[in-house]
């Protein structure tokens, strides 16, 4: 166990947003989702775009506290809509979160985190799975 945890977040079915509304609208949604995520983080924690429609977060608090923050944020995102070209776009997100363990390398930590993310997707999306 450690003092920080790592989360990987994926915007669910994002290809459909791009296909239906176009890439400019999709990019706007990703920017807004990322900005909203940053507003929910405590001082010292960091969020960044991981690639495509994924974000990574490094939390400076325990996995339990971080999971609570992510759960609240995921429900917040699901209840919002984003406007692009006068069209309302709603999205949901799935996340996997894990704690960094001192005897594990970075690849192992990210592998466990990625496994938790895909478990969240398999379990129905719009949720956080902690590994």
Listing of model-derived features with the role each one plays in the protein:
Residues 14, 33, 50, 55, ...:
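Hydrophobic framework residues that shape the active-site pocket
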Residues 58-66, 85-88, 93-111:
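Catalytic strand-loop-helix junctions within cyclic-nucleotide turnover domains
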Residues 46-49, 89:
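A short pre-motif secondary-structure segment
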Residues 23, 98-130:
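Catalytic-core segments of nucleotide cyclases and related cyclic-nucleotide turnover enzymes
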Residues 34-35, 65-83, 112-114:
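Alpha-helical scaffold within the catalytic cores of cyclic-nucleotide enzymes
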């Amino acid at each position: 166990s450690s003092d920080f945890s790592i989360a990987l977040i994926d915007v669910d079915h994002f290809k459909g947003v791009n296909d239906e509304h176009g890439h400019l609208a999709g990019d706007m949604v990703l920017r807004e989702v990322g900005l909203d995520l940053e507003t929910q983080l405590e001082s010292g924690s960091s969020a960044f775009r991981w690639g495509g429609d994924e974000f990574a977060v490094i939390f400076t608090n325990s996995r339990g506290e971080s999971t609570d923050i992510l759960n609240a944020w995921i429900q917040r995102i699901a209840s919002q809509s984003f406007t692009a070209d006068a069209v309302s776009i709603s999205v949901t997100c799935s996340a996997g979160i894990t704690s960094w363990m001192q005897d594990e390398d970075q690849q192992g930590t990210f592998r466990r985190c990625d496994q938790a993310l895909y478990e969240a997707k398999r379990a129905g999306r719009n949720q956080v799975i902690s590994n």
